[in-house]
Structures are given as structure tokens and as C-alpha cells.
């Protein structure tokens, strides 16, 4: 079938400023923009745009919007990116989700985000609905991508694991929420940044180990995050299937390991990039990674492609609309 993203759709309200105001202070910002967003939408858009045009698999978005102007614009954005929106529901009496994003231009485009979930709160599916979304009798491998901007992704992950064993579960636990150790083992491809990686370790391993890692990170950042990546792979991942851990380290680069190459590898970030807005960088990276792996590329090749794609995204404003096309990445490769 292809790649399905189950997640959030938000309308982004972006304010660009030199700095954030202090408590009780009114500060004049530089300018204001609106964009399509939500981690689910961003990842689906990235997958749609970074998919090789010669590939014939489908890209689907599963989620909900309100019956308002914001919702219509979000659905149009997905369609323009080549994403099937058949299962994007429209709810009456509830607004489309929104994200208020504050972007500090004098701090390298770093952002802070406030979410109002709106119609994303309705993205909950019972077994009957899941059977309709994922019909029986499909033998093709499918990737299903999750984040944590919807109420209960874990219940859907458990259903897929039990009922569609040929599916690969891709999980980006953002914003982070702790889960029992056994539930992390349901994931086939885990994609985290350094903060989320450390949060997982803190939630499932003993405090003494966590304190030791925290103490050493300041002196050996890369070495300690290698240890975290190893822990996530060796102690949590479902190695019966693909078994991949990818950890992004912002401007430093990416750590990754897999069942094919359990030793943690490091790819430095692309340097000398003019950073405008980092909002869509992580979602672009995930989109590129998933498309490349689904198309049969090696993990190393997929990481290189994704790193280049995200480096192009951060040179433009916005999230979904700032993401490059497959041909743009190939041109810069």
C-alpha cells in the first residue's frame, strides 16, 4: 500500500522576533506569518514531497480538522504535496488545531511552540475503524508513522502490532510521553532528537545510570549520546523486524544503528548553512528517512538524503511549504 501517517494537523501562527519578551513586557516583533503545520501534517507533506516520483506507492494522512478555513487550507496543502486525504475527517463544533510559534531570529532561528489540539483530540480510532483504514488481505509491507500530538497513539500501535504483523511501525515520540519498557519494544523504527532520547532513558532505566550519563554529557556530548543510542537499540527495540534507532543532534549531526549494523554510526551535519527557520527540520528529516527506507535504500544512504533535505528546509520560512522536493535534494546531492 505505501506509507500512512497518523497524527496531528495544525494551523501555524508564526511570530518572528529578535528576542522573547520578559514576563509582563510588551515587545515589538519583526513580522507575522501563517503556515500549514502539525507534526503529522508536516511529516506526511515531507514524505509526499520527498518520495521518488517514479515510485508508485501511496502516501496517506489520517487525522482530523475542524469545519473552518484553517482546516480547508490544511487539507489543500496535503493534496498539493501528493498526500491522500480520504481519511482526514472534518468535525463540526470544534476548531482546527493551532500552533503558536515564536521564532528568535537573532538566535539562529530557534523556536518555541504552544499547541492547542482542537480537532486533533478526535483522532482516536476503535478496532472497527482501524479495520476500515487498514483492510485485511493486503500482503504488501506498509509503514505507519506516529508522533504524540494525538491522544493515544499507543492503542493504535498495539492494534497494528497484533493485527497487521507485516507493517513497520515508525515512531517519533514528540512531544515526549513516558511509556512502559515493553511498549517501546513494539516500535520498528524509532526517530528521536537528543532531548527525547534522554527522556526515554530517564523513563525506563534506573536513576543511577541516568545521573551518570547526565554528568558526563557536558564533557563528552557525542560519546554519551552514543551510549544512549546503544541503550535504546539493545534494550528497547524490536529487532525481529527492521530494528532501527536514529537520533538527531541538531547542528552536530545524526547517530544511528540498526539490526544490519548494530554499532552506532555518526554522520556530521552539513555545515555553512544559512539558517532562517528550524521549525520543519525534524519532520523533513523523518520524511526523507522513511521514503528512502521504504524505497529500499540502505540506512546510511537514507540518513545522508534526509540530512541534506533538512538542511534545505531550514534555509526557508515555514514548515510544509519550506520542504524541498525529491528533485531538489537530488540536485544538491
UniProtKB/Swiss-Prot annotation:
Activity: how regulated: Activated by a monovalent cation that binds near, but not in, the active site. The most likely occupant of the site in vivo is potassium. Ion binding induces a conformational change that may alter substrate affinity.
Reactions catalysed: D-ribose + ATP = D-ribose 5-phosphate + ADP + H(+)
Residues annotated as catalytic: 283 (proton acceptor)
Listed pathway(s): Carbohydrate metabolism; D-ribose degradation; D-ribose 5-phosphate from beta-D-ribopyranose: step 2/2
UniProt keyword annotations, A-Z: ATP-binding, Carbohydrate metabolism, Cytoplasm, Kinase, Magnesium, Metal-binding, Nucleotide-binding, Nucleus, Potassium, Transferase
Matches recorded under PANTHER family: RIBOKINASE (PTHR10584:SF166), SUGAR KINASE (PTHR10584)
Organism whose genome encodes this protein: Saccharomyces cerevisiae (strain ATCC 204508 / S288c) (Baker's yeast)
Miscellaneous section: Present with 1780 molecules/cell in log phase SD medium.
Subunit comment: Homodimer.
BP GO terms, sorted: D-ribose catabolic process
Entry GO CC: cytoplasm; nucleus
Ranges that cross the membrane: none
Binding annotation for K(+): 277, 279, 313, 316, 318, 322
Residues the record lists as binding ATP: 193, 248-253, 282-283
PROSITE patterns: PFKB_KINASES_2
Enzyme class, broadest EC rank: transferase
InterPro entries reported in the protein's UniProt record: Carboh/pur_kinase_PfkB_CS, PfkB_dom, Ribo/fructo_kinase, Ribokinase, Ribokinase-like
Gene3D superfamilies on file: 3.40.1190.20
The protein, known as: Ribokinase
Subcellular locations according to the entry: Cytoplasm; Nucleus
Cofactor comment text: Requires a divalent cation, most likely magnesium in vivo, as an electrophilic catalyst to aid phosphoryl group transfer. It is the chelate of the metal and the nucleotide that is the actual substrate.
EC numbers, comma separated: 2.7.1.15
Family, as annotated: Belongs to the carbohydrate kinase PfkB family. Ribokinase subfamily.
Required cofactor names: Mg(2+)
Binding site for substrate: 10-12, 38-42, 149, 283
Amino acid at each position: 500500500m505505501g506509507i500512512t501517517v497518523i497524527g496531528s494537523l495544525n494551523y501555524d501562527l508564526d511570530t518572528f522576533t529578535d528576542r522573547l519578551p520578559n514576563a509582563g513586557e510588551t515587545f515589538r516583533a519583526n513580522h507575522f506569518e501563517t503556515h500549514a503545520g502539525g507534526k503529522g501534517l508536516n511529516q506526511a507533506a515531507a514524505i509526499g514531497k520527498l518520495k521518488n516520483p517514479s515510485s508508485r506507492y501511496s502516501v496517506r494522512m489520517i487525522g482530523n480538522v475542524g469545519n473552518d478555513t484553517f482546516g480547508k487550507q490544511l487539507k489543500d496543502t496535503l493534496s498539493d504535496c501528493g498526500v491522500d486525504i480520504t481519511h482526514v475527517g472534518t468535525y463540526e463544533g470544534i476548531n482546527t488545531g493551532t500552533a503558536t510559534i515564536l521564532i528568535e531570529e537573532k538566535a539562529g532561528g530557534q523556536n518555541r511552540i504552544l499547541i492547542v489540539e482542537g480537532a486533533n483530540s478526535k483522532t482516536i480510532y476503535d478496532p472497527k475503524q482501524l479495520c476500515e483504514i487498514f483492510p485485511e488481505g493486503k500482503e504488501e509491507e506498509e509503514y505507519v508513522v506516529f508522533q504524540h500530538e494525538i491522544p493515544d497513539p499507543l492503542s493504535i500501535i498495539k492494534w497494528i502490532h497484533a493485527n497487521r504483523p507485516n507493517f513497520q511501525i515508525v515512531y517519533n515520540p514528540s512531544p515526549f510521553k513516558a511509556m512502559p519498557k515493553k511498549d517501546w519494544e513494539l516500535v520498528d523504527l524509532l526517530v528521536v532528537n537528543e532531548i527525547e532520547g534522554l527522556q526515554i532513558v530517564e523513563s525506563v532505566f534506573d536513576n543511577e545510570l541516568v545521573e551518570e550519563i547526565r554528568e558526563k554529557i557536558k564533557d563528552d556530548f557525542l560519546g554519551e549520546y552514543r551510549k544512549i543510542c546503544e541503550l535504546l537499540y539493545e534494550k528497547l527495540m524490536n529487532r525481529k523486524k527492521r530494528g532501527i534507532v536514529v537520533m538527531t543532534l541538531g547542528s552536530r549531526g545524526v547517530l544511528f544503528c540498526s539490526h544490519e549494523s548494530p554499532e552506532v554510526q555518526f554522520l556530521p551535519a552539513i555545515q555553512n548553512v544559512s539558517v532562517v527557520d528550524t521549525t520543519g527540520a525534524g519532520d523533513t528529516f523523518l520524511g526523507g528517512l522513511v521514503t528512502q527506507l521504504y524505497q529500499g535504500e540502505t540506512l546510511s544512504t537514507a540518513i545522508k538524503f534526509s540530512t541534506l533535505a533538512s538542511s534545505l528546509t531550514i534555509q526557508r520560512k515555514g514548515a510544509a511549504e519550506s520542504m524541498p522536493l525529491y528533485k531538489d535534494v537530488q540536485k544538491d546531492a
